[in-house]
Regions:
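Active-site glycine-centered loops adjacent to acidic/histidine catalytic or metal-binding residues
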Residues: 34, 72-73, 101-102, 182, ...
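Extended active-site neighborhood of metal-dependent phosphoesterases/phosphodiesterases
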Residues: 79-173, 194-219, 228-267
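Short acidic, glycine-rich surface-loop motifs adjacent to enzyme active sites
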Residues: 171-189
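Binuclear metal-dependent phosphoesterase catalytic core
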Residues: 235-308, 312-319, 357-366, 370-386
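Short, surface-exposed loop motifs enriched in S/T, G, D/E and P with embedded aromatic residues
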Residues: 321-336, 348
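Conserved small/polar residues in nucleotide/adenosyl-binding loops
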Residues: 393-400
Length: 404
């Protein structure tokens, strides 16, 4: 346990601290979010995911300090499954620090202050912080229950803002700061301040102001898609795709991002990050589609680059000749369209494919040409795919590294 519940009238708490035997200046953490289990079938699927994630993380944990951050929606309005989730997530074999999500709140209670009581009984405080090397981690609750049926907004209350201000006053300016919360601060640079939004944080500007003296990374979930927003040279948000992907009905998220987790490698006050599709090697960072795969773009080669930001480069080659960079566009991922097309299987109408802005297109001169897509991430790592016909069924066949 990393916390002790305080009891009224008790003045003394005895506990033993365990020394970290590894140098935490170099450490690694995985970010999972929106596990959202609501039945035994979901728990079984999550158990399978946990086994794969553990197998991948073991090589890092042998050499470095390693842990897990869970960005909320642990369950799907089913707090009775907290003990089962705890048991299954223990299979990761790493310490897990959790963040409350909107589906983890108690509904029907009289105020926001009562909405997180059951969560705290199982997982401890809704906001806290800790250090690893030259990195400072802040865990927040920005799911603000407004006591109308199942209504909530993204909002950080004044009590928490005052605590953040005091907390950061103790953090050296040259240390990295990671802020973990469930609802994104903003999904675009066009921040909608002071709007009552359930999918963004209405007073995010107050948080940004507190972070202005630090290099900070916001890490969030909630949307069930993957995306990055670079606000400026010192502030960036990473919105992480869902573990439950298509609500356990599909292993693709609605934007075409495969089920997986964020991987962050910290060295001093420097950090590198990747998205790890749980069923594929780390080198699988995008999916290319041949012309004819999309009804929206029938003539185009497409590439869905799920962890893209402005410092990535997406190029394409026709018969070995570099044709330049592909054009970013907004559209539907073809495999996601196929995966979500079985409406009977999907159930709810809102479980569907949604347009993404990390899609890229190009029109080949020769439809029979050999087309390759080459993607370079912000850290200089290059990924390449030969374009061929791809379907959701094909993706679920778990392509080998050679295929990619």
């Amino acid at each position: 346990a990393f916390f002790f519940p305080l009891k009224k009238g008790r003045l003394k708490y005895d506990f033993e601290l365990k020394r970290n035997l590894k140098d935490d200046m170099k450490h690694v953490f995985m970010v999972q979010t929106d596990v959202q289990v609501s039945c035994q079938e979901h728990l079984d699927s999550y158990r399978s995911y946990v086994g794969k994630a553990r197998a991948f993380m073991e090589k890092y944990a042998k050499e470095r300090d390693a842990f897990v951050l869970d960005c909320g929606d642990i369950v799907g309005n089913t707090p009775g499954l907290y003990p089962d989730y705890i048991q299954v997530s223990g299979g990761l074999g790493l310490p897990v620090y959790r963040i409350i999500g909107n589906h983890d709140m108690e509904m029907g209670v009289r105020s926001f202050e009562h909405s997180y009581k059951t969560y705290e009984d199982y997982f401890g405080p809704i906001y806290y912080s800790f250090n690893r090397g030259k990195a400072h981690y802040i865990i927040l609750d920005n799911c603000f229950y407004i006591n109308r049926d199942y209504r909530y907004i993204g909002y950080i209350d004044e009590r928490t803002l005052q605590w953040i201000e005091k907390d950061l006053a103790l953090v050296p300016k040259d240390h990295l700061v990671f802020v973990m919360m469930h609802i994104p601060s903003s999904t675009t640079k066009d921040i909608k301040f002071n709007a009552l939004l359930p999918d963004e944080t209405s007073n995010a500007n107050s948080l940004y102001d507190l972070l202005k003296d630090h290099e900070a990374h916001l890490i969030t979930g909630h949307t069930h898609v993957n995306g990055n927003v670079v606000f400026n040279d010192r502030l960036m948000e990473h919105n992480t795709a869902a573990v439950c992907a298509g609500f356990w009905k599909s292993m693709l998220c609605s934007d075409g991002t495969p089920q997986g987790f964020g991987l962050y490698e910290v060295d001093g006050n420097q950090v590198k990050w990747h998205y790890k599709a749980v069923d594929y090697p780390l080198e699988y960072q995008f999916q290319a589609y041949a012309p004819g795969s999309s009804k929206e773009f029938p003539e185009e080669v497409l590439a869905n680059v799920w962890n893209w930001d402005e410092q990535w480069k997406v190029e394409w080659f026709e018969n070995g000749t570099c044709m330049g960079e592909m054009t970013r566009c907004k559209g539907l991922d073809p495999a996601a369209v196929e995966a979500f097309s079985d409406r009977e299987k999907m159930g709810a109408l809102w479980v569907n494919a949604f347009p993404t802005n990390h899609l890229f297109k190009a029109v080949p001169k020769d439809k029979k040409a050999r087309i390759e897509v080459l993607v370079t991430d912000r850290f200089g790592t290059v990924y390449k795919q030969l374009v061929k016909a791809v379907s959701y069924t094909h993706l679920r066949a778990h392509e080998t590294e050679a295929d990619l």
